[in-house]
């Protein structure tokens, strides 16, 4: 019986997500839907344009803490060392990728791991990468304090068959709307919130 209620909850969450396509709240709802199906500790929806710095679209922490300064560090250039960013730039096809598929050898000794990943993403990461021809890349990162299980990766791989098209539809609809704050404005908003 509990599986039935879990399935009902997932379908209801998917319905809510569909109604928010083109709405700024889409990313939060999509993240909550995925969190309902597979446990993870943090998530980041981000757009990497072909030129210029990335734009954070939604940040989620299952257990909120005060780490906005780390996001500023990431957006102000540390993203260049992110193996997922590099995978996006190298033209990996749209899909779900595990950290071990994109990280270089000795990743855990890298500057990026030591200065950002270990404290913010934690232990493991998967990303849903959507290539947007002539625009850039949309990415939805899911981070965990533990390694994702084979079952969780299988479920996320199955979900990617509809998550990626939803991300693409949302992107197309949201381009008709005025854009959110630029990275510099977001950085200013984060600094203001901390003071």
List where the protein language model places each region:
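Inter-helical turn/loop segments and adjacent helix faces that build the functional surface
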Residues: 144-151, 170-174
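Signal-transducing coiled-coil/dimerization helices and immediately adjacent hinge/linker segments
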Residues: 169-195
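Regulatory input/activation interfaces that engage signals or partners
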Residues: 2-5, 9-147, 161
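Alpha-helix capping at helix-to-loop junctions
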Residues: 118-122, 165, 169-172
């Amino acid at each position: 019986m509990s599986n039935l209620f879990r399935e009902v909850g997932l379908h209801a969450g998917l319905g809510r997500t569909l109604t928010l396509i083109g709405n700024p709240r889409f990313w939060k709802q999509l993240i909550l839907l995925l969190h309902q199906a597979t446990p993870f500790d943090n998530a980041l929806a981000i757009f990497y344009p072909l030129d210029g710095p990335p734009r954070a679209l939604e940040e989620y922490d299952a257990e909120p803490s005060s780490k906005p300064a780390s996001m500023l560090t990431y957006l102000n250039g540390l993203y260049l060392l992110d193996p997922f960013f590099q995978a996006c730039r190298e033209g990996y096809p749209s899909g779900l990728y595990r950290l071990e598929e994109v990280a270089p050898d000795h990743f855990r000794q890298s500057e990026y791991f030591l200065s950002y990943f270990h404290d913010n993403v934690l232990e493991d990461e998967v990303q849903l990468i959507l290539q947007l021809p002539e625009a850039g890349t949309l990415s939805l990162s899911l981070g965990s304090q533990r390694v994702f299980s084979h079952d969780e990766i299988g479920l996320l791989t199955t979900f990617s068959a509809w998550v990626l098209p939803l991300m693409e539809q949302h992107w197309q609809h949201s381009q008709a709307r005025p854009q959110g704050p630029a990275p510099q404005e977001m950085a200013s908003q984060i600094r203001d919130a901390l003071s």
